[in-house]
């Protein structure tokens, strides 16, 4: 696969497992020249589909409360050294209004896993944002929730949900999180 055309044909025909194996090979075993060729080809594809654009998102960190006590996280429940806050719906909407004036067309609402923001409360915020700014996307990143919750937030108008997970290794996950949290729960989200 010395030229981009044959590599392109291979990638278009390959399944996920084959792509994963190919990337693993290129990252771990391929010669520097082959890795460089792949990087050049990947950059050409990125430019073909996305151009030289930069996408800006308006990040609104609306709460630093979290019910979890993950060992690495500054928002962890047991961290008594931070001043906790929660933004009201009005404050969140004011952030969106300001961001809209500045040209943002995607708002990312991010928080710890804060039980105060029920589906109804968070859904109301999302609905209001979409009502005021119908040409904007809303992404939520509020930790693990139930399937019912994701569905309710989608129905309220959320366009995306960003669920962070730190690792796919059960052993490593156990070193980062207290026993009451489970990688299996996090992985189940991907089956939705």
Residue ranges of each PLM-predicted region?
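N-terminal pre-triad scaffold of radical SAM enzymes
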Residues: 38-78, 84-110, 159
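Core AdoMet radical
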Residues: 77-92, 99-120, 128-192
């Amino acid at each position: 696969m010395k030229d981009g055309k044959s590599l392109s044909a291979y990638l278009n025909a390959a399944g996920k497992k084959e792509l994963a194996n190919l990337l693993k090979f290129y990252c771990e075993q391929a010669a520097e020249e082959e890795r460089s060729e792949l990087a050049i080809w990947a950059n050409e594809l990125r430019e073909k589909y996305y151009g030289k654009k930069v996408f800006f998102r308006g990040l609104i960190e609306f709460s630093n409360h979290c019910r979890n006590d993950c060992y690495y996280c500054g928002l962890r429940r047991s961290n008594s050294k931070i001043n906790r806050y929660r933004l009201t719906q009005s404050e969140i909407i004011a952030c969106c209004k300001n961001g809209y004036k500045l040209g943002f067309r995607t708002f990312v609402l991010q928080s710890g896993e804060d039980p105060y923001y029920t589906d109804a409360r968070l859904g109301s915020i999302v609905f209001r944002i979409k009502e005021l700014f119908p040409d904007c996307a809303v992404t939520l990143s509020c930790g693990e929730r139930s399937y019912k919750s994701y569905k309710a937030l989608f129905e309220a108008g959320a366009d995306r949900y960003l669920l962070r997970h730190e690792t796919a290794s059960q052993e490593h996950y156990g070193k980062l999180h207290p026993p009451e949290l489970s990688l299996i729960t996090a992985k189940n989200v991907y089956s939705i």
